[in-house]
A protein has these predicted regions:
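C-terminal amphipathic "assembly/sorting" segment characterized by alternating charged
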Residues: 198-274, 284, 295, 304-311, ...
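Extracellular polysaccharide-degrading/modifying enzymes targeting complex plant/algal/animal polysaccharides
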Residues: 8-14, 30-31, 158, 244-266, ...
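Acidic Gly/Asp/Thr-rich repetitive segments characteristic of extracellular carbohydrate-active
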Residues: 267-305, 567, 572-584
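C-terminal accessory segments
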Residues: 156, 226, 230-260, 270, ...
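Glycine- and acidic/polar-rich repeat regions and solenoidal domains
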Residues: 1-234, 331-340, 355-381, 388-548, ...
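Acidic glycine-/aspartate-rich tracts in secreted/extracellular proteins
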Residues: 301-302, 321-324, 512, 536-539
């Protein structure tokens, strides 16, 4: 939380605070609830009047969670603010009689950029301009919520007596009525008016999405310009002119302290200085002394390390020759990771073998690549063409995100994981079931997994919190051979992904005692499992019936050279024709 108006004392009520001409700068996705940029009140003070005015502020890329400005009290005014590329909304979350007017929302098509979300009664929303917002559902340009019957104050009270007029929506993906409808939220909005609004979007056939009954909404005198003529009560197709937006200088004028440059900084490109390293060199010292953006090139050979290679800056570590992978082996006296990513770390690692075999008289490596504890900054990780082998303890993993750490993106491709007792890829440390998760964007592509006792892929986002949009998970063209056949085991354990694609994967003699895929998803989450092959493998277990799409296959795989761990399908085989399993590199 950046700024809170606290109302926990009678003297705090009807405060008539003014929050104006401030600059709220970039805030990255947090991966959990509690990352609002501004909040006025709490659910316990929802029906108390704050009378706070929030005006003439600039919010730029404030994307901590879905609620950029969270209103949880009554009789507030939010006006003349600009939200620029914020992945979130102004949320009238609790409280009545709030006013949102003359604000400018600019998304520039950025994912999850949103506008205004409406809960509770008596609000007025007018003269706002919303342009290029790409968010859906809770991140919509306009989301008018369904409510919970007989709701507790901290849940969802019915939208009643809300007036929305003279707003302009240009190239916004989603205007939605009945947002959040499910088995709990079943009360549609009532006594709501949507009048004199303009909607321009040549990519849409209809102006809004009705998630629930809209009988309680009066549509009147709205003008639309869509992909084709649209005629419905309250809407007419007319040629309308999009509003002229202010230029960048005008948006930033008089926002923030006079001495502060109120613009998201674009860091200068790092100089990619190269460091050529031979076996026998102390890798930890090379990494410590390397400049940010440096490229550490390892010659063929074995690199024993006694403690973790500590990555707290942008670095690339790669093999000098991809065909002759350097081998990193742990021989420390105390268990440690081979690589630890810390605050400031952005790592690319290519064509390296991590061998977890136990050295006589030495400790085991806890992980090939993992993170420090309690990181503040998000990190990024790209692992390409690497091998992870011989990690012999069940609690020690090849790649792992630890609790209280968060990755903006993790990309793992063209890798081999073999002979592991623990998980291969584990981003499942946040098990408090409050919506936290360890990585926002994950891509796992063209990887092989052979002879694993643990889970090849384990990703967890527990609970029912709806303040975030991730994780976004894509798993494609992977092959799993002799993996996790124990009772109640899973090849993939995917709990709570909000956007998921699993496609073109091959399961060979895997998950027999449990499942190939164990997916726990909500009805509204965008999940898709398609074009996979299951040979002598377990079933797919999902919470809803919507995840598995299209045909699944049951062909005996034939590989180019399984003895050398090359699980690419033989040319001309059924899997190769169907583009299932590994792609040729």
């Amino acid at each position: 939380m950046t700024l809170i108006v606290i109302l926990n004392d009678e003297r705090c009520l009807e405060n008539h605070h003014r929050i104006d001409h401030n600059y709220f700068g970039e805030r990255p996705v947090y991966g959990s609830n509690g990352a609002e940029t501004m909040r006025v009140g709490t659910s316990q003070q929802a029906y108390s009047s704050s009378n706070t005015v929030i005006e003439n502020n600039l919010f730029e890329r404030c994307s901590g969670e879905v609620e950029v400005i969270s209103i949880k009290s009554s009789d507030n005014i939010i006006r003349n603010n600009t939200l620029l590329e914020c992945e979130g909304v102004v949320a009238l979350r609790h409280g009545d009689r709030n006013t949102v007017n003359d604000n400018l929302f600019i998304g520039n098509g950025r994912r999850n950029t949103g506008g205004i979300r409406v809960v509770n009664a008596g609000h007025q929303i007018y003269d706002n301009v919303l342009v290029g917002l790409a968010g859906t559902r809770f991140f919509s340009a306009l989301g008018v919520m369904d409510a919970v019957p007989n709701s507790l104050p901290n849940r969802y009270c019915q939208v009643v007596d809300v007036k929305m007029y003279r707003n302009t929506f240009v190239d916004c993906t989603n205007i939605e009525f009945g947002t959040g409808k499910d088995m709990e939220r079943t009360l549609a909005p009532e006594k709501v008016s949507f009048t004199d609004n303009i909607i321009i979007n040549k990519g849409l056939d209809q102006p809004y999405i009705a998630v629930d009954d809209v009988a309680g909404i009066q549509f009147k005198d709205n003008k639309v310009q869509l992909a084709k003529n649209y005629s419905a009560p309250g809407f007419t197709t007319e040629k309308v002119k999009a509003p002229q937006l202010p230029d960048d200088a005008a948006i930033r004028k008089d926002k923030g302290a006079s001495w502060f440059k109120n613009q998201v900084a674009h860091p200068a490109a790092n100089v990619h200085k190269e460091y050529n390293v031979s076996p026998g060199t102390n890798l930890s010292e090379v990494i410590h002394s390397a400049e940010p953006g440096g490229v550490i090139i390892l010659a063929k050979g074995t690199y024993p390390i006694q403690r973790a290679m500590f990555i707290d800056k942008p670095l690339t570590i790669r093999a000098a020759d991809a065909a002759n992978k350097p081998l990193v082996r742990f021989n420390g006296d105390k268990p440690d990771n081979m690589v630890t990513i810390a605050d400031g770390g952005k790592m690319v690692i290519e064509n390296i073998t991590f061998d977890g075999v136990l050295e006589p008289g030495k400790a085991l490596a806890k992980a090939g690549i993992s993170t420090a504890f309690d990181m503040i900054q998000p990190y990024t990780l790209i692992v390409d063409g690497c091998e992870f082998q011989n990690f012999g303890e069940g609690g020690f993993f090849a790649i792992k995100g630890t609790k209280a750490t968060f990755a903006e993106s993790v990309t793992i491709r063209n890798c081999l994981f073999r002979d592991l007792s623990g998980d291969a890829i584990n981003y499942a440390a946040e098990k408090d079931d409050i919506g936290r998760y360890n990585a926002d964007d994950m891509l796992i592509e063209n990887c092989s997994f052979y002879r694993l006792l643990g889970l090849p892929i384990n990703i967890y986002r527990g609970g029912s919190d709806e303040s975030t949009a991730g994780p976004y998970i894509t798993i494609r063209h992977c092959t799993f051979v002799d993996c996790c056949n124990k009772e109640r085991g899973s090849v993939m354990r995917l709990i709570g992904p909000q956007v998921l694609t699993v496609e073109n994967c091959n399961f060979d003699n895997s998950g027999r005692g449990g499942a190939t895929i164990r997916l726990d998803e909500a009805t509204w989450e965008k999940v898709r499992i398609a074009n996979c092959n299951l040979w002598n493998s377990g079933r797919m277990m999902t919470t809803t019936s919507q995840a598995i799409q299209g045909k699944m296959y049951n062909f005996r795989p034939a590989y180019i050279n399984a003895e050398a761990y090359d699980y690419t399908p033989v040319e001309g085989s059924e899997l190769e024709k169907l583009s299932i399993g590994l792609k040729k590199k």
